[in-house]
């Protein structure tokens, strides 16, 4: 096992407070889903947001909205635009909905139902859902059916968004968002580079450029929009919010040995931090800035003999800035006829260097000295008054209840109040003791990633049509995966029910009360002010977190990320 983390494991560490293995998202070393900050904030009645310049399914943003043993499980058809299906290669079989699992990252994103989600990765939502209640629909259509306000690659529509009671899903590019600066290329040592240093130039395709209507979508723009929407949300106004903002391509361009790309994305993150500071009151909002791992690039005195480098010209004073890259596992110098880096993503590797973390606002005193990435979870959770212990998680699920309802000839098991668990299993047994319905089937149910994904503070519905019959009695058992909370009831299947249960819509009950009562929250309020957290993160050494949370970082698709 490598001592150097990838973005999935590091993002999971601060999202859940649990260590895991590289390529895994929000599961423990046994594969059991662990509650993340977004889910816990929702359980406590707070508004939640997730902003990134990467594909929204990438590791860092995915760690705030999904649980997956493989970070590559982007959608129900794997990692494609929907024209093909490679889910068998990109996902654990037991996780797929058609096999009784909790679903892909994109599907779980909709289940998580953050109030604001902004990033890239639009093409993966054109995949077709393979199992469950939305089978046969695209993920985009599923989002609309679940009540999302959707924006696809439309800067003007993003800027026009106002809070209207719906969760926002705005994906601004098919893949990762374009970088601020056009790319540079790292090459072998060459005296000519010192004579002609490179000046970084703006990328014409960067969404931060103003369009004909004067609108743009830089990371700072998206951060401002997210905070506006969260502060307009009644939950945000009454109970605070959690927002993670990621400057993802600092890391991605470091993998590519693209100095101009890195610098532009670092500038974009810096402006996003300024935007957050301008929007919030630091008496009421904790802002944390950090990174999930270190990387290859270093500013050095002169071009090294042992590594590739780029010589830049400072736009301030014209001084030379030499950036070196030396952590690629590829044989970069094996062939003297190949003088420059080929820009294959992930050819440069992460390092184990210690990272900078900075914080301002309530709870910032916890960010002091040498810390662990899992400590970020506790800093944020304690500041917001969220559950952090096994007993507190059990308390969140203590109010779990369920019923079987029939509408339009379809029977469903409707579960609510299981807010300390990310997933659950169920069995339905008839009067003769025969199991007629079961999550995942007998073998798959033993896999921790199988079962049903909990829609925190919402009704989670399971289709039992053709499994049960009207008028007959059944024993139904529902068990939370993480807390072990279990409830068994004898239920007689009714005729048509008059009450309408809409999967994915928020429900009443004790979810918020349980969330607030279960966790100590000494900083939950300052006077009458509601606390928020913003986390800003990057995939390199220089990034940050905030408790109305903003984050910048890259979780990528390749194994080394």
Question: Where are the predicted features?
Answer:
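Conserved aromatic beta-strand anchor motif in extracellular beta-sandwich/beta-rich domains
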Residues: 426-430
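Solvent-exposed serine/threonine-rich low-complexity stretches and specific carbohydrate-binding patches
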Residues: 436-455
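Surface-exposed, short loops/turns at beta-strand junctions within beta-sandwich domains
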Residues: 419, 454-456, 461-472
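C-terminal low-complexity, Ser/Thr- and acidic/Pro-rich disordered "stalk" regions positioned immediately N-terminal
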Residues: 481, 487-524
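A post-motif C-terminal structural segment
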Residues: 1-5, 10, 58-401
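Structural beta-strand segments of beta-rich domains
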Residues: 407-413
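Short, aromatic- and glycine-rich surface loops/edge beta-strands on solvent-exposed regions
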Residues: 470-482
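C-terminal membrane-anchoring or membrane-association module
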Residues: 533-561
